[in-house]
């Protein structure tokens, strides 16, 4: 499967000094990524990065910028967001073994992307970075009011009500003076 926002970089074209790379998603790429990530729209998506090679490993460090529109989890209203996220990704060759083998990564290796072959995909790495920066629970400005109108309490209200109910069920509740 070809990624929606593919920007392949051949590793053998990277020399000893870092190489600057600027990528930007076109309109069709943004539309297909929006569908992939369940977004209303992606109005802009770009990344500026420096690629550094050390043997078979390539480090991409830079900044991702995006303008997205998500749906409010409470009202389904559009929630625009502007994203600017710095990232550092280490591309390493796929380890020997099957694709389904479990690979243990240390904490310092959490942003590792494995590649197979002679290229890395800077666009797909940017798309994955975008997906990780999205708000998992976007809420519009009127979300709280809509939830209250539907009879849904906030966590604080539910917690306070539970505490009152717990105190009322206490065997010592009848000993309390009014």
Predicted regions and their residues:
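Charge-rich, low-complexity linker and terminal segments
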Residues: 1-15, 20, 90-178
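Charged, alpha-helix-enriched surfaces in structured cytosolic catalytic cores
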Residues: 24, 28, 63, 67-70, ...
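Helix-adjacent hinge/juxtasegments
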Residues: 65-100
């Amino acid at each position: 499967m070809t990624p929606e926002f593919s920007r392949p970089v051949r590793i053998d074209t990277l020399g000893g000094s870092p190489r600057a790379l600027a990528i930007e998603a076109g309109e069709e790429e943004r539309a297909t990524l929006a569908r992939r990530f369940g977004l209303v729209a992606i109005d802009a998506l770009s990344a500026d990065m420096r690629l550094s090679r050390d043997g078979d490993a390539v480090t991409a460090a830079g900044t991702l910028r995006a303008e997205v529109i998500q749906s409010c989890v409470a009202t389904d209203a559009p929630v625009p967001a502007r994203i600017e996220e710095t990232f550092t990704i280490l591309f390493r060759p796929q380890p020997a073994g099957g694709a389904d083998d479990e690979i243990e990564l240390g904490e310092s290796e959490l942003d590792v992307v494995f590649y197979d072959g002679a290229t890395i995909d800077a666009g797909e790495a940017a798309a994955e970075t975008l997906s990780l920066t999205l708000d998992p629970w976007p809420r519009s400005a009127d979300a709280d009011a809509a939830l209250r109108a539907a009879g849904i309490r906030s966590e604080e209200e539910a917690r306070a009500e539970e505490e009152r109910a717990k105190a009322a069920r206490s065997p010592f509740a009848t000993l309390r003076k009014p």
